[in-house]
Amino acid sequence: MFNKSNALMVFSTLIFSAALSAQDYTYDPQRSAVLLVDPYNEFLSEGGLLYPISKETLDANNAIANMKDLVNAARASGMKVIYVPHHHYREGDYDGWKFGGGSGCVFKAGTWNVEYHPDLQKQPGDLEARQHWKSSGFANTDLDFLLKLHGIDHVILAGMRANTCIESTARYAVELGYHTTLLTDAIGAFNMREMQAAVEIDYPVIGHNVLSTRELIAAIE
């Protein structure tokens, strides 16, 4: 006989057992990488088309500073930082797509908007995957190849947007066999409801670890 209370208890156990605390896990820099997803001016800088609707969550999370601290700590430990960029739109890119592509209004090729935020520029030794067309950094890119080439089997996700590209890339990572860590405060979204749904409901189900930036840095230092 179905018992709602028991079902909720089991579901809660599954959710919260999926994510470990920082004290339970450490990260080998030679086997781990930070995946920095879409750190574009379009999202992160005043003047970006998506900045006005991202600003609330970016400010609430202190997200840009946390992303910067994360990649700096990763580099200092010898861990790879891999940029995972969204496709740069050119006129005609989506012509003939059976179910449509994007609006073509954002991420325009050759513009300041698709440059990386000034505090999150690539550094020598960083890697960059091929651009993803939709949400997942793995679909139709070389990200899986880059990770395997460098012997990496643990990925840590940060960047934009919490409930789309971050979440989709994390789901693919888990399906492909990577130990996957999601961060609660090195991300942004278009509003707090999106952020809360991602962090409180989806991430604990998807990820092996769900940590704050401080917890993650402590686990790699």
Predicted regions located by residue number:
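Bacterial N-terminal signal peptides that target proteins for export
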Residues: 1-9
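Active-site-adjacent betaalpha module
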Residues: 2, 22-33, 68-77, 99-221
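N-terminal signal peptide c-region/cleavage motif recognized by signal peptidases
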Residues: 17-18
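Acidic-leg catalytic submotif of subtilisin-like serine proteases
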Residues: 32-43
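Short acidic/His/Gly/Ser-rich catalytic and metal-binding motifs that mark active-site loops
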Residues: 43-47, 91-93, 192
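Acidic/histidine-rich helix-loop elements
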Residues: 44-60
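N-terminal post-signal-peptidase region of extra-cytosolic proteins
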Residues: 56-66, 70
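Short beta-strand segments at enzyme active-site cores
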Residues: 79-86, 183
